Amino acid sequence: MTDKIAVLLGGTSAEREVSLNSGAAVLAGLREGGIDAYPVDPKEVDVTQLKSMGFQKVFIALHGRGGEDGTLQGMLELMGLPYTGSGVMASALSMDKLRSKLLWQGAGLPVAPWVALTRVEFEKGLSDKQLAEISALGLPVIVKPSREGSSVGMSKVVAENALQDALRLAFQHDEEVLIEKWLSGPEFTVAILGEEILPSVRIQPSGTFYDYEAKYLSDETQYFCPAGLEASQEANLQALVLKAWTTLGCKGWGRIDVMLDSDGQFYLLEANTSPGMTSHSLVPMAARQAGMSFSQLVVRILELAD
């Protein structure tokens, strides 16, 4: 008798719409691979009842809070249900850009200079020291919520007088916000599948940076896989990504986003432990380059669930 698989999709985070698309694609791919899979939306179904509903395994196609941040993973562990992707701690750390950066920095891995602010600090007014630290980053900077995905709440700030509005927007989505030095080179993403590192993808957005619209709505964003790196650069990138992945304790599948700055140095941006699986998504693109169909990819991700 084959396992009955729940594909968790939708949910209640800011990335609900993306997750619905991801989940629908995953569901179709699993069924194509002969898997007995069913959609479950935590917004509409009590996921504490998954076991009593007869499910033996869970494919997490949720993005953002409540699906990618360790809370759901902890619940599934208490229920004794195997699930795809990283465990509780690695999921929580990867969702938190600030703590990811602190860990990577502590491990000697390259990250862009940044300043972190809390909502309380912002509301009471920034100190001279904080203002000096922000000023030292130069312009432009990227302002982003620490625990939000899909570039939700993110802004590029090119003038000092635009910083307050960018911070206000970011603080609508989180209690902690990062202000990062702008890196001028191309962005890459590298997918990991079990023990295998897939070919890197180079991202060329039509606008000034890879925001929500460029990720999910624009047909003008260009993706290159292979990424066009020299063999030695690709090897360096893969080695960096593997170190970043293991430092956070990630497993199963996911991807890590990286920038190549004008100085020729790769800088780690963030880890994604439940990446998008839509028509614009990058893990399926990398898997295709490695000779794997979408259906084979999702079946393999499910096989890695524990």
Swiss-Prot record:
Residues holding Mg(2+) 2: E270, N272
Pathway per the UniProt entry: Cell wall biogenesis; peptidoglycan biosynthesis
Reaction catalysis annotation: 2 D-alanine + ATP = D-alanyl-D-alanine + ADP + phosphate + H(+)
Protein name: D-alanine--D-alanine ligase B
Family indicated by similarity: Belongs to the D-alanine--D-alanine ligase family.
Annotated binding of Mg(2+) 1, by residue: D257, E270
GO MF: ATP binding; D-alanine-D-alanine ligase activity; metal ion binding
Cofactor dependency: Mg(2+); Mn(2+)
Annotated gene: ddlB
Active-site residues per Swiss-Prot or TrEMBL entry: E15, S150, S281
ATP-grasp domain boundaries: 101-303
Keywords: ATP-binding, Cell shape, Cell wall biogenesis/degradation, Cytoplasm, Ligase, Magnesium, Manganese, Metal-binding, Nucleotide-binding, Peptidoglycan synthesis
Predominant location: cytoplasm
The organism's place on the tree of life at top rank: Bacteria
A cellular-component GO term for this protein: cytosol
SUPFAM superfamilies registered for this protein in UniProt: Glutathione synthetase ATP-binding domain-like, PreATP-grasp domain
Assembly and interaction partners: Monomer.
Chain sites annotated for binding ATP: 134-189
EC number(s) from the headed UniProt entry: 6.3.2.4
